């Protein structure tokens, strides 16, 4: 089971989807993953399982012979699915359905790197802060859009890999490159935009810009 998603899986099974077994193919394949790791790694790790189960399903023949993959993703899982399609399987991905995926990154990632974990964590704050700053996945959640308010005013600028307080420039650059790679691959597929179905919330307070100051950050 995938903790927190049991109800969704049960609902899909009630609609007739079934998980594969050793003896029978299935068309519902839960993919829990280690969210701390790079989304590049996770997409590559998923590929053999997805492609194996897709081939088993297609082997039934008939109307299943041309089956394709539909991803149902929450939060960062949508970035993993986009990376999978871009690097491993655009030809057999039919849809990517996402719930609350930060497609172009999240200002929360900047906050975590620059300011650390919340103070309410008490004595665990330092440990959680150090852990967060070591995660490739957190850096791949950094905003890819122009989000920095310059001191002089004027147009917003993109994040500078060396400009985030307490950030590792190499890890920041790698995280930003993740978005560049995925977006570049997607632009070569004129059908890709129609494959993504993003379900989002409205009227939710969301930080979208940051100003770096001598004393820290202003969101």
Functional labels for PLM-detected ranges:
Residues 165-219:
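C-terminal subdomain of alpha/beta-hydrolase-fold enzymes, centered on the catalytic histidine
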């Amino acid at each position: 089971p995938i903790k927190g998603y049991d109800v969704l899986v049960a609902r899909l099974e009630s609609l007739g989807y079934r998980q594969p077994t050793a003896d029978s193919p299935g068309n519902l394949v839960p993919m829990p993953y280690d969210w701390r790791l790079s989304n590049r790694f996770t997409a590559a790790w998923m590929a053999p399982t997805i492609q194996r189960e897709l081939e088993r399903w297609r082997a039934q023949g008939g109307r299943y012979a041309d089956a394709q993959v539909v991803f149902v993703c929450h939060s960062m899982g949508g970035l993993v699915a986009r990376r999978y399609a871009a690097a491993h399987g655009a030809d057999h991905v039919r849809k990517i359905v996402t719930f609350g995926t930060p497609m172009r990154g999240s200002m929360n990632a900047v906050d975590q790197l620059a300011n650390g974990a919340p103070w309410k964590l008490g004595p665990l704050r330092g440990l959680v802060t150090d852990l967060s700053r070591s995660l490739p996945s957190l850096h791949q959640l950094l905003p890819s859009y122009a989000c920095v308010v310059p001191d002089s005013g004027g147009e917003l600028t993109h994040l500078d890999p060396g400009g985030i307080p307490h950030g590792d420039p190499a890890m920041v650059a790698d995280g930003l490159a993740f978005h560049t790679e995925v977006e570049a691959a997607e632009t070569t597929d004129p059908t890709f935009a129609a494959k993504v179905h993003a379900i989002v919330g409205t009227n939710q307070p969301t930080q979208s810009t940051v100003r770096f100051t001598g004393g820290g950050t202003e969101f």
